[in-house]
Amino acid sequence: MYRYKITIEYLGTDLAGWQRQAGVMSVQQILEEAIYKFSGEQVILFGSGRTDAGVHAVGQVAHFDLSKYLEPHKIITAINYFARPYAVGVWNCELAPNNFHARFSATSRYYIYRIINRPCPSVIDLNRAWWISSPLDVPAMQQAAAYLLGKHDFTSFRASSCQSKSPIKTLTELNIIKEDEEIKLYLSAPSFLHHMVRNIVGSLVLVGKNIWQAEQIKDVLEAKDRKAAGPTAPASGLYFVKAAY
């Protein structure tokens, strides 16, 4: 068997997320069907991160096995041809060791969350960022973010449907940068809880609106109660950037 590692980008707006689900179109299904059309083999695609409906990716990593060797550049061309007309594309393909696993071999995952912060919405960024019309206090958000760095029990920022065995995670990066009318939040960790990034963003926005003081984020973290945290930020602003190995 030959194991292939592919890197994928997609717009999640009209998709049901990464994972295959009955009755809806997912990234996994689109790619698995595309691979079958040119290889004749039913494969199972394993992704480095299972993004939700509406979440985008610029560097999602996945792997699959084929019984015969195909040149990686031909695999890229074939997948992109058969994945049409969906907003899903493969931009890299390479052979990987048989013990490589896109999910379990990953040592870190990186996300970006985009906020458009101006009085009028951005037509260009429709469904690609969270539009917030009122000015956000970015320094206060940065101060609050510092409380979340490191190893913590992130139960307060965990979705009720989360299947992770432990709420203990290590947030290695949480940077907030304002560039003109756009605010970007950069987050990285070895792994994340379900909705963890979006729940963190939703809570930091409450700080940015001066509804909460920055210090309240520490109280939310220590509460270990989802009801203590802010709302879940929209999926449209979230991007899976890359996985490190």
UniProtKB/Swiss-Prot annotation:
Keyword Isomerase: yes
Gene3D superfamilies associated with the record: Pseudouridine synthase I, catalytic domain, C-terminal subdomain, Pseudouridine synthase I, catalytic domain, N-terminal subdomain
EC numbers, comma separated: 5.4.99.12
PANTHER family: PSEUDOURIDYLATE SYNTHASE (PTHR11142), TRNA PSEUDOURIDINE SYNTHASE-LIKE 1 (PTHR11142:SF0)
Protein name per Swiss-Prot or TrEMBL: tRNA pseudouridine synthase A
Segment forming the signal sequence: none
Catalytic residue list: 52
Superkingdom of origin organism: Bacteria
GO biological process, one term: tRNA pseudouridine synthesis
Recorded family membership: Belongs to the tRNA pseudouridine synthase TruA family.
Pfam families: PseudoU_synth_1
Gene: truA
Enzyme's top EC category: isomerase
Summary of the function given for this chain in its UniProt record: Formation of pseudouridine at positions 38, 39 and 40 in the anticodon stem and loop of transfer RNAs.
Subunit structure: Homodimer.
Residue stretches spanning the membrane: none
